[in-house]
Each structure stands twice: as C-alpha cells, then as structure tokens.
Amino acid sequence: RTVAESVGRVPKGKKAKVLPYRIHDNPDPQKLETLREFTAKFGYKVKTAGTKGAIARNLNKLMDDCEGKREQKLIQSVALRAMMKAKYSIHNIGHFGLAFDYYTHFTSPIRRYPDTMVHRLLTRYQQGGRSANAKHYEDLCEHCSDMEQVAQNAERESIKYKMVEFMGDKIGEIYDAHISGITSYGIYAEIDENHCEGMVPMRDLDDDYYDFDEKNFVLRGRRHHHKYQLGDAIRIQVAKANLEKRQLDFTLAE
C-alpha cells in the first residue's frame, strides 16, 4: 500500500502528469447516519461526523470490533451500502476507504490492466516524456472500471450457481439460519451450517400483512405486530433450487 500511495503522489512544485488513480469518494452522509442507527442496536457507538480521515478510522474500527461476531456480515453489508464505489480515473480525489490523498493500483499478484498503464506511464515520464493524452486515459480508466464491475458480477453469479447446485439434492431439509437481507418482496436467509443464501418470498409470509421498513431493515405485521429484522435467527426449509435462475427458495419451518 505504501508503494501504491507513493507512486501517485505529486511532488511539491511539480505539475501533475496524467496517471490513472484508484479513487474512492466520500460516503453518503444520510446512509452513514442509517449505519450509525443500525449498529447502535447491536451496542456499537460509531461517530459518523468529523473529518474524512476520522470517519474512515471510525468505520475501520467498527469492522475490527464486529469481526467474528454473529452480526459481522450484516454490519458489513449495511456499511457497504453507505460507501461509494471505488473506480479508476485520472482526476484524483483521494481514496476514502484507505484515507489516502493519493492512491493508484501499482502492483498485484494477478496483473490488472490499470497496473500496466501506470507502469508504462512511469517509464515514459522517467525517460522525459510529455504528459499523456488525458481523454484517452480517462476513457481507458472508465473502461477498466466497467470491466471490473462485469467481473464482480460474474463472480457473484458463479457463487450463486454453485450454491444452488450444492443445495439441489436437499429439497425438504430443514436448517438453522439467520436473516441476511430484508426487502419489500421477501426475506433473505443464510444457512448457518453452509452459508448458502436463499429467499423466503413475501407471499409465503401468510400469517399477516407485512410492511417493509427500509430504514431499519424490518418487516412488520399490521395485525399481530410480529416483525422480522436483520440478524434474527430462524428455521428454514429448502423449497426449490432453480439452477437456471441461480435461485434458492425457502419456506419458514414450524
């Protein structure tokens, strides 16, 4: 990280030359407040006001404090929703998550194309070359950011596929699970034993009419006031495993 930070730093008195940076904008203040309120339910006190560096340190401390605890994945999920997405650009704004003013992807075990761009430009500049064409490299940065998202989506879909494939012969089996997501159309549940995730559709929650509280990640019943919220322990039964759609359907077990 130190090398990656130093490579992108502009010496005093020097005009910055074109270079691809790894940038990460400040998080959405409203979403940070939602994160603060959510984590308070688990006993965490997170300060979401102050300087950019202070907020980053507070969030990193939160990740350390919840590590290994049952609510870790839930808190990480809510925290990620508050974060902006990191991307590549020649227009440096710093990297919030790392609390760096300058950061670039300089090296990795598996070579990324942005690393190669940086290597080529450094060689060019060390040999006295002029600053590269800004529009050309910004277009390349945008393309790399887009392809990174494509790769991440492919990774997620492949994981879903293997989950459904694994659970295909377990229809009807009952597992301990916890609620890993709440939406207006149902409950996501993650099986404690194997971490496979599926959905209990809203249509199967037929004991009441449930309203979705998006801010607090809760479903509340209108008549009986029963509620489902992130982290709740539940028992599920595997209902369907649709490999084509990469989708697991659960029902609540009695």
Set out the residue ranges of the language-model regions.
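Append "with occasional cross-activation on large, charged helical scaffolds in nucleic-acid assemblies
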Residues: 1-192, 199-201, 206, 210-217, ...
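A conserved acidic, glycine/proline-rich C-terminal tail/linker
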Residues: 218-225
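OB-fold/S1-family single-stranded nucleic acid-binding modules
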Residues: 226-254
